[in-house]
Amino acid sequence: MDFIEKLKEKSIKKKNVSTSEALELFVEGTGNPYRVLAAASEIREHFKGKDIILCGMTHLISAKCTQECTSRASFHSNPDHVSAQKIKTARQVLAEAVQAKKNGAEFFSIITGSEGLKTKKAWKNICQIIPAINKSGIKPCLAAGMIDANQAAQLKAVGLLRYCHHLQNDGKEDRAMMNAVKAAGLSVCAGVSFGIGETFTQRIQSAEVLRKLNVDAVSINMIDSGSENKRDRAQTLSPMEILMTVAVFRFMLPDKDIKLCGGRKNNLRQLLPLGIIAGANSLMTGNDLNATERNSKLDHEMIADLGLIPTREIDLCTCDTKGKQRCAASSAIKSRSLV
């Protein structure tokens, strides 16, 4: 049994893959990338089956960055860079959630930015929106920067399922907050961003932090290679390096949801389907954190072509029968409980 196979079996048995082993795996993958991707796919299927989770999202606050942030993740973690323009109404957000459900999303994330819940009006607005989203039949998530234990408990009480937060470099305050959120009974999705000048060792260290935090899901964001707002410190990652990063995360976080988010379309390009083969079991659909639109039907088509199953299917029929008859491209909407 060679190194890749041994590490795959170790991961499937939920024995921690060390940071040194993860780095060696990455080096091994530069010479045998498809073997590493195939092994990561086996780990994904062992823990997640053939299900692929789709997520929708909206920005509650329409804003712009004054410092040319390299990604939406850094944009929302730097409140001094943000110039707020408009707050969406509860009705607008609910309409977007309903549309996300129609697009096959299982989860719907509201992103407010770091300043999102610092006013009573904003807090009241969120506490009204979350129950409404729940009633619509899609699972509500929230990304609103730093919150305390009392706020986490209140969000849980009004029906929030998952809190999303981007992991910063130092991470001390982030880790404390994520633990408080988990203690309140909320699921935690931690975001990480790559392509901002970090080394691969730093990516592995991020995975190690997330493993210690025992988060439920990880959203992977990549600096958008098609964006004009890139700082000098940003780097362009090749599709294969991104795939190897996803694969190593699957080895280190074998039973967690791993979601491809910001920059997935422009950075992975024609290799986007391999992001799932590399170990991802979740996708941001409709749009992503870099605001590059991708038709949700393309995601469903891609999932079907891979022989996998979206947790909420949509009708892909585009023939002239307009739904009156079932065709080979048509599928019934299916909802499944996922927590």
Stretches found by the model and what they are:
Residues 148-157, 197-210, 266-278:
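Catalytic cores of alpha/beta
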Residues 76-96, 100-177, 181, 186-196, ...:
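Core AdoMet radical
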Residues 1-31, 211-339:
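Auxiliary Fe-S-binding modules of radical SAM enzymes
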Residues 39, 128-136, 154, 158, ...:
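Alpha-helical structural signal in soluble globular domains
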Residues 122-128, 175, 203-207, 237-242, ...:
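Charged helix-capping and loop-helix junction motifs
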Residues 56, 140-143, 190, 258-262:
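Conserved hydrophobic beta-strand within the GNAT/NAT acetyltransferase core sheet
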Residues 35-78, 85-109:
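N-terminal pre-triad scaffold of radical SAM enzymes
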Residues 23, 55-58, 81-82, 109-122, ...:
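Glycine-rich, proline-tolerant flexible connector loops at the mouths of alpha/beta enzymes
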